[in-house]
């Protein structure tokens, strides 16, 4: 009998692990380590008198991330669903605490970090994971209410508003955009009415637009984005240096370690703008490969979501869709900012940019997805009734 003829729940344990997902995850993390070492070497040598300062710390974060992932992968998804409410309250509490002077750590004008000894935790990263878990739980339990009533539409909108408001107080405009866009997409997939969804989009666009217009430095970023070369030595400096890096790379790049932009020309070369260094050292070909790996990872996550939906597992399905959408938005924004397609925002490239909080939460999200896939592979299939409207739309959206 061929393996394809054996039901998933009867396969050996080693074959129930999603090796495709695991290999993509490890490949992106490995590339991240190499690129952090390359992009940060000059800055680390001058600032810390140790060329491998950031690379060493990145290795520590990778080890911590994998240890945390091993812990998370052992937690049943039913536990996350049951404790989604307390998780939300704890996260909101942390978002408030980080704003208190003397407790929250201010870096580059933003108060986003809580110092925990050897590591500073960026609370907005925890908020992203919390949002996926909480709203997947909420929509799985109340998708009929979401589809047929105003209450089901307004309740999650209120929670999103609290999240976004606290993030903007830090301020963290980029995370607020990613989080709200992810939740809005999850609401649509879960079955919110089309005209409710359109109203949601208009509220979101109007709100974020108002925040940008009323904030002078955000407005300046928008103006600079439209023509960065008009003020290339001041407000447009970072973006123009990033574009120069893309131009230097041409088709195949200058080679690993040969970037010129990382030599104090491009600020944040090892964090928010690491994709520009990838494009400079490996060219268009290397940039396309990185994007391709992310596309493959996201597609696989969405396939896992669809498979869980087909089995009637609503919470894991919506949570997996949330993780896939979250990664999609964050990769799109980071790549778009680096290449000049979007206004500058402070968002990391998942798995690749230097940043302990980002890497740890990315590992947690991947372990969460691995757990969802593993549970679906060992579950004995049960007959599933004709899906209701929210499920039907979800299947059609992922087909």
Curated annotation (Swiss-Prot):
It is a multi-pass membrane protein. InterPro entries: Cell_cycle_FtsW-rel_CS, FtsW, FtsW/RodA. PROSITE patterns: FTSW_RODA_SPOVE. It is found in: Cell inner membrane. Its main location: membrane. The keyword Transport does not apply. The keyword Cell membrane applies. One of its GO terms (cellular component) is plasma membrane. Residues 42-58, 105-115, 169-171, 215-281, 338-348 are periplasmic. Pathway: Cell wall biogenesis; peptidoglycan biosynthesis. It catalyses: [GlcNAc-(1->4)-Mur2Ac(oyl-L-Ala-gamma-D-Glu-L-Lys-D-Ala-D-Ala)](n)-di-trans,octa-cis-undecaprenyl diphosphate + beta-D-GlcNAc-(1->4)-Mur2Ac(oyl-L-Ala-gamma-D-Glu-L-Lys-D-Ala-D-Ala)-di-trans,octa-cis-undecaprenyl diphosphate = [GlcNAc-(1->4)-Mur2Ac(oyl-L-Ala-gamma-D-Glu-L-Lys-D-Ala-D-Ala)](n+1)-di-trans,octa-cis-undecaprenyl diphosphate + di-trans,octa-cis-undecaprenyl diphosphate + H(+). The chain crosses the membrane at residues 21-41, 59-79, 84-104, 116-136, 148-168, 172-192, 194-214, 282-302, 317-337, 349-369. Pfam families: FTSW_RODA_SPOVE (PF01098). Residues 1-20, 80-83, 137-147, 193, 303-316, 370-399 are cytoplasmic. HAMAP family: PGT_FtsW_proteobact. Peptidoglycan polymerase that is essential for cell division. Belongs to the SEDS family. FtsW subfamily. This is Probable peptidoglycan glycosyltransferase FtsW. It comes from Cellvibrio japonicus (strain Ueda107) (Pseudomonas fluorescens subsp. cellulosa). The gene is ftsW.
């Amino acid at each position: 009998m061929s393996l394809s003829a054996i039901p998933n729940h009867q396969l050996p344990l080693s074959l129930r692990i999603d090796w495709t997902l695991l290999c993509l995850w490890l490949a992106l993390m490995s590339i991240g380590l190499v690129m952090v070492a390359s992009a940060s070497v000059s800055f680390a040598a001058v600032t810390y008198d140790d060329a491998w300062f950031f690379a060493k710390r990145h290795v520590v974060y990778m080890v911590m991330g994998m240890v945390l992932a091993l812990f998370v992968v052992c937690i049943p998804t039913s536990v996350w669903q049951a404790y989604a409410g307390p998780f939300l309250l704890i996260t909101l509490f942390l978002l408030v605490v980080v704003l208190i002077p003397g407790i929250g750590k201010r870096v580059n004008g933003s108060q986003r970090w809580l110092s925990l000894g050897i590591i500073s935790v960026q609370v907005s990263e925890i908020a992203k994971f919390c949002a996926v878990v909480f709203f997947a739980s909420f929509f799985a339990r109340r998708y009929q209410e979401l589809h047929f009533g105003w209450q089901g539409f307004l309740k999650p909108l209120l929670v999103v508003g609290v999240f976004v408001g606290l993030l903007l107080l830090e301020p963290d405009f980029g995370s607020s955009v990613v989080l709200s866009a992810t939740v809005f997409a999850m609401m649509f997939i879960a079955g919110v009415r089309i005209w409710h969804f359109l109203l949601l989009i208009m509220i979101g666009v109007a709100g974020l637009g108002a925040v940008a217009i009323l904030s002078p430095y955000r407005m300046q970023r928008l103006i600079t984005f439209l023509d960065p070369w008009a003020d290339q030595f001041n407000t447009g400096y970072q973006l123009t240096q990033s574009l120069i890096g893309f131009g230097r790379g041409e088709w195949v790049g200058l080679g690993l370690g040969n970037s010129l932009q990382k030599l104090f020309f491009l600020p944040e070369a090892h964090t928010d703008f690491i994709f520009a260094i990838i494009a400079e050292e490996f060219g268009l070909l290397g940039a396309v490969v990185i994007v391709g790996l992310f596309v493959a990872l996201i597609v696989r996550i969405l396939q896992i979501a669809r498979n869980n939906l087909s089995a009637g597992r609503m919470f894991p399905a919506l949570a997996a869709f949330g993780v896939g959408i979250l990664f999609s938005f964050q990769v799109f924004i980071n790549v778009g900012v680096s290449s000049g397609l979007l206004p500058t925002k402070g968002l990391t490239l998942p798995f690749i940019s230097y940043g302990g909080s980002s890497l740890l939460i990315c590992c947690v999200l991947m372990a969460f997805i691995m757990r969802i896939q593993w549970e679906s592979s060992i579950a004995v299939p049960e007959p599933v009734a004709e899906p209701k409207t929210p499920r039907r739309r979800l299947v059609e959206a992922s087909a």
